[in-house]
Amino acid sequence: MPSRPRPSFVSHLLPGSLALCGLALACAVQGEERRSLEPMVVTGSYNPSDTFDLPFSVDSIERRQIADGQLGINLSEVLPRVPGLVVQNRQNYAQDLQISSRGYGARSAFGIRGLKLLADGIPASTPDGQGQAATLNLDVAERIEVLRGPASTIYGSNAGGVIQMFSRDGQGAPRVGAETTVGSDGLSRNHLYTEGEGDGVGFLVDASRMDTDGYRDHSAARRDQTFAKLNFRPDADSRLALIYSSLEQNDTEDPLGQTWDAYKHDPRSVTANAELYDTRKSIDHQQAGMNYERYFGEATLQVNAYVGKRSVVQYLSIPRGVASNSQRGGGVVDFDRDFPGGTVRWLQPVSQAPGELNLTVGLDYDQSRDDRRGYQNFNGDQLGVKGELRRDEVDTATSLDPYLQASWAIDAWTLQAGVRHSTMKMEVDDRYLSNGDASGSRRYRKNTPSFSVMYAFTPDLHGYLSAGKGFETPTQAEMAYAPVAANAPDVFNFGLKPATSSQYEAGLKARLWGNTRVNAAIFQIRTEDEIVVASSLGGRTSYQNAGKTLRRGFELGLESELSEHWNANLAYTRLSATYDSDFEAGGKTIGKGKHLPGVPESSLFGELVWKPAEGISMGWEGMYRSQVYVEDSNSEKAAPSYAVFNWRTRFEQRLGAWAFHQLVRLDNLFDRQYVGSVIVGDGNRRYYEAAPGLSWYAGAGVEYQF
């Protein structure tokens, strides 16, 4: 069969280019009078800046959007409104969400990879790039900033994009509150909090518990989260915040993936091995940190420091015969992780320069140390329990990154340039020596520069160009297992190389009719040594380097206050992500032009919000996603495209010192059966994870102000 010609660069980006030209024409006829809808952000620039004036793609999701009719459980509730992001809710709290930005992170079998997660400036990702979205607590979020494109490379390794949450400070009169939510599949969530300010000290204490039976069989979960924050001024020239957070999930059931036939027969079903081995995961995550800021005239010193501990025990469905092999690492993963780190940053305005010139110099230090053990997942005839020791090692990842950034606004021009020197060292101290000593280390070094320039054609139309070079080291989890023969011992994959990338972006930012904001961008990313799945069996995944990949795309974001009572939001992404050279994987040749698995070609999110009166809001949400390939050869059944629609409403009342609110939410209004996420490259062909049908949720809350 003759191969289908690959779409040209022009065919991929022509629609985006036409959209950019249309924006330019629309803005050229706008008057000078306008009302800015742009929020202030610090991600990408370190200095608080209007998103409209920054020469790269950055968005902010505000507190009202995070809280309006949402459940406050998962980032998948709010992140789809950002173009370029794909958020897949696995309906599996043992494996967390899958989030990708312009294709970065799509390969992740669990957790977040390829993206930098931050909370109040403190990393929520380990130095090697592994993160968990659940550690970001939506109950306390003031805003979430999302940076995409070349400018994200200033954040170093594994920063294909940056997602940064900022918690709110305790302010105003002290108050206490409680809310409860119930819903489909046995969902219940209870939330308590107190916050306010007294004697110059702001405080916020928050605790919640979520229970669910899960949509699929064997997917029950309980999640407990706590958060505490104190913020105050030690003196007139400084600010200090002390922050503590925790996440606990005990015996969270893991339903694993589904084959296509099993999914079609019963979307709620699980493979027999999930119940036979009682696949599950327990997480205990605790973290404490501080943010200190001191002003020296016009200059600012910022210091962040944190310490944390994370313990995980995970029971896999590794068959008994494999788990008992003395050359293998068993079927139970058990590790205790300590992760300290900190940042020192100096922000210096240069008043002698023409225009507005700001310099930033900083140093980031991060470390994670895993005391990792592996056990058989059986004891005698009893399956799904911890048996004999099969792996014992200490894995350490350490990064030390100095960086420099300059931003210069002069007349109609804004220029920003930065460079970061990233050093990452991974070490393994093998203490299980009966099958050989697998100790070793690997060091990665790379300079990641970025440059952006913006020109203000009019006060309401800004155009920009951005370029950068990045790199993505493998995570310790990706290096944990080398692709080896069946009778060879499990060894660390020190041969895995980092992926390197060159990114380019061009965009327009426009304000139309005084009430509408539009951001549009076209981009291209070329990557070498892309890290891809080599094999995935029974919950154990090994990785390898492929050749080259090519990603070209277009993003469009729109936010409009249509009238006093109506708001609209739109986020559209068109992305072609393909392999740009042949490579060998799993005994097969993956040909140039094959699509990267886990990356939809088209994504669309739309929202219409009606607020007929104070304290009443109603929203309609729609989301479309094109088909998603599940493995590199693109020969297995792709997860089909789908469109789903949701509806929500929220009511608020005030009575003296009391405030009340209620919410009702319906997801998947038309009860569509669809695959919500995929497990890339699963060796058992269990690629698919079903999403729920029609689901309902209802909640109520009360707050008292002293």
Write out the residue ranges for each language-model feature:
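Gram-negative outer-membrane beta-barrel transporters
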Residues: 345-353, 359, 409, 415, ...
